[in-house]
Each structure stands twice: as structure tokens, then as C-alpha cells.
Amino acid sequence: MNAPIIDPLQGDFPEVIEEYLEHGVIKCVAFNHRGSLLAAGCADGGCVIWDFETRGIAKEIRDNDCSAAITSVSWSKYGHRLLVSAADKSLTLWDVSTGEKIARTILQQTPLQARLNPGLSSPSLCLACPLSSAPMIVDFDIDCTTLLPVSVPEMPDVLAPPQRSKCPESNPPFSPAAACFNKCGDLVYIGNSKGEILIVDYKSVRVLALVSASGAAPVKNIVFSRNGQYLLTNSHDRTIRIYENLLPAKNVLKSLEDLGKNIDGLDGIEKMKTVGSKCLTLFREFQDSVTKMHWKAPCFSGDGEWVVGGSACKGEHKIYIWDRAGHLVKILEGPKEALIDLAWHPVHPIIVSVSLAGLVYIWAKDYTENWSAFAPDFKELEENEEYVEREDEFDLIPETEKVKVLDVNEDEEVDIDTVEKDAFSDSDMSVEELRYLPAEPIPDTNDQQDNLVESIKLIEGQISASPASEEAGQNGHHASSPQAEEMGETRGKRKRKPSEKAMELQAEKAKPLKGSGKTVRAKNRAAFDQETDDSINGGDDDDDAYY
């Protein structure tokens, strides 16, 4: 849709269900960095990748060792790798282009969510949030996991050393913690069961700052906006909170260390809270004051202007959209099915939501065209009106009154090689990004080939039993006999229609004749045979053919 003919007063958010995608029972979805590919995890352990431009399946990925439901899918920054977590406690890293498995590891707990490091072009490092364990960093290259802290002890000097092992021991059950990377991938933000947000350096496994939230409710989800300027948390107190990120986009670790050095007279938790207040500040809170419902899979829009959250109530498929100022602007109501996951398109105002039945619904904007943008004097009519033209409206304009054509430099070279950078893209142009997958033809199986051979034999049998074949047999010539080939008759060819003269003679032959019928019948029979021979040998070129 061209931007000039879109009404600028309309909100840039989805409004109606445009289409739905179906492939087994879908459990989770994720867009790649450009939004050209949509990955989905299925209940049978497989993954499917749709080309979102054509809405066709581009690739299917399946691990023979996994038959459990997929819990999350995550793209690498440039789209070459896909991380899949499953209910059988496995993490699998895939090469999207070739469909080959790069690495696979088994955790001690079921990972509810796993995310690849967004700061690496070919990441082999991911952040996993297990069901009953602390968030951990998983390194596929060395097959090692590192548990991250989820709380700050009273005495920071007695911090326990980080637990690094190939098979970390399972900890006592506790409320699961949510975690995510920042935009550059050098810090991890963890929301714990106390409602606190910990800023952790995952390389040294140190807590650098602490942010306390009001209410002290456990944090269920935590996610950054695409530009890294805002942080969203979803808590058990049915409130979505938006924090503004005060740290710079680059050299984040150095900035945090400088903040800690500039604070004197404080130690321990108080110092971390002071540093945290200079890292994040509460910007807005969102909640339904009437129903007090829980929220499912909240996230930002691609440009960060909108906040979206799904209703966690059973039996309803509702999506709430707010602007950053905190105003509820739209409620999208879908089918009577619970919502389990959703994602906002990185570039376009499109939302995809997953229902409990396993369908993927695509929500898009209902555009109203504004054709007056092409001509300022364009007037939209509510109904048909009779137009009376002026007397000189279509008269030829004299040469002296013609508008002078603007001078255009036709010799100037037009740049057709430079690609304009997307407004929301932060990709490095030096690295080739995977935007589309080539179409792969599906080879015929042995069963399909056998069915094709049987179909051909069946058709040949029907042709051999056709009336034309029976007529040829009655005349003493088989359809494939040499005599039939000499006469120009072969199976599958068209048969000549007798001429009008032959038809008339045949009709006269059937009538009873008076007088000496033997002589007349002999003459008619000779003429009819001669005409029939001419027809068979192609004597009548103007006759029509029939099957």
C-alpha cells in the first residue's frame, strides 16, 4: 500500500484478522530481524518456517531425537541460525539455510524460553530460562552452562563463585525467573521473584546494578524494545511496567563501572540500587483496572511506539494495544480460543497470535484510502452526482498558454545500486543477512511414481476399450495394425467426419426404393463407398474433425 494514499490520522496498529496459517499444532512463533520469515514451533517437536511475503512454507526443520513440544524459537541477528527449546529439556541450534543441526544439549530443567545473543553475527551463546532453576548461559562451542544470580546477598564480599559445569546440579524448586539480553548482548537483565531487576555481567557473573519495582511481585516476562531504549516487565500483580533505559547504546560496561566509581559512601545493596536508579527509571504502568486480568506474551511494536499484551483468560482471544503514554487505543477480539503466544512484525503494523488450537492468526490494518493525496482539488463524493462541463473545459489550449516544461537534467546518472537503510534496522551492512529462503522442489516418492504408472495403464485400458477401437475391430483392422497405420489411423488421433454428400447417400440408402431397386442400390452403394474412401484418405480438407 502506498503511503501517500493512507489516511495519516489512522493509528498505525492492526485492526482485523487478515489470514491464518495452519501447520499441525503451533505452540510459539518468532520473526526474523527483517520480518520476512516467520518461525514456529510445533507440538510434535518440529519447526516450520514461513515466507511471510508469500505466506508459503519455506522450510521444515525436525530433529529425530526430539518428539516433545517446542517451547520457544529464537533467531540470530542476521537470520542464519535458529535456536529451538523443547519440553524434553533440549536446546538445539540449527543452520537455517542448510537445515543442518549445529549443536544440541540437554539441560536439567525444561527451558521455558531461550534467546540467542543478539550481539554476535554467528552466535553459539544463548540465554535459557528453565522452569525451576536460575537463568543460565549456555555455550554450545564448549558444551558448558553457567548459572546466573537471581538475588543479591546482604554481604557482596561473600559472593559464591559462578557455577560452571557441563551438567549443573538441579537447585531447590523456586519461582522461575525471567531474563533477556540487552540490545548489544553484553548484559543480562533478570527479573526475580521479589520483583527486582538485576543487571548482570554474564562473563564475570557479577551483579552490577539492582532496580526495585513497586509491589514486589514476581516478574514473569522481561523484554527490550527493538531500539533498546525501553524495557518491559510483566509481573504477577497483573501490571505491565515500562522502564526507560538511561545507559548509552555503546560501551555499556564501562559506563556502569564509571557509575559505581562515582558513588562514594555506599556499599552493598544500597550502592547497587543507587547505580540501578541511574540505569532504569519507571516510565509507565499498564493494567486493566476493571477485570484485573493477567497478561500473556507482552511486547513492543517494531518502532517502539505501541505496547501489546494478550489476555491470559481461558476461552477468549483478546489483544490489548496501548500507546507509550498509557492510553488503551484498541482491543482486538479473535475467536473463542485462548491465546498462548504473540509477536509484532519488526517493520509493518502486523501482529501474529497463536491460539490454543494451534492456529496462527495474522492481524493487519484495515486501510482506508485517501485519494485526495494525489490531487489537492480532489473532492470525495458521498453519492453519484451529475456533472455539467464548462463550454471551454476541453478546448485545446493555445501554444502561448501552455505550461512550460521544467528543465530536467536527463544526463544525470541515476543511482540504482545504493539500498536505503530501513528506519528500524540496526544490522551491519558488511554482514550478509538471510532474508529469504530459496524454494526447494519436493521430489516424487516411489509411491507417487507407482501411482502414476498405474494411472497411465488405466487410461490406456480405457482407450483400448473405446467405441473407436471396437469399430476398427469390426472392420478387420486393429487400432495398432500395420494396415491401420497405412490408412493414417493411429490410436489417440482424431477421426475424420464423413462429408455431407456421404451422409445424404447414407440417408437415401435407408429409404425404400421403387422400381428396379437393385440397379439403384448398386449405384448408391458404389458412390457411398467411394465417398467414404475419400473421407478416410483425407479427400475433404474443409470438413471438421471430431473425437
UniProtKB/Swiss-Prot annotation:
Tissue expression remark: Strongly expressed in root tips, shoot apices, vascular tissues, developing embryos and endosperms.
Official protein name in the record: Protein RBL
Domain of life: Eukaryota
Source species of the chain: Arabidopsis thaliana (Mouse-ear cress)
BP-aspect Gene Ontology terms: vegetative to reproductive phase transition of meristem
Function comment: Promotes the expression of FLC and FLC homologs to repress the floral transition. Promotes WRKY70 and LTP7 genes epigenetic methylation (e.g. H3K4me3) and subsequent expression.
Disulfide bridge partners, by residue number: none
Assembly and oligomerization: Part of a complex composed of TRO, RBL and WDR5A. Interacts with TRO and WDR5A, but not with WDR5B. This complex is formed during both vegetative and reproductive development.
Sequence ranges of the WD repeats: 21-60, 65-104, 214-253, 285-332, 334-373
Biased composition (Acidic residues): 530-547
Bias-annotated ranges (Basic and acidic residues): 499-511
Region feature Disordered, mapped onto this chain: 466-547
Stored Pfam families: WD40
Subcellular location: Nucleus
Keywords: Nucleus, Repeat, WD repeat
Mutant lacking the gene: phenotype: Eearly flowering. Significantly reduced trimethylated 'Lys-4' of histone H3 (H3K4me3) levels at the 5'-ends of WRKY70 and LTP7 genes leading to reduced transcript accumulation.
GO terms for cellular component: nucleus; Set1C/COMPASS complex
Organism taxonomic ancestry: Eukaryota, Viridiplantae, Streptophyta, Embryophyta, Tracheophyta
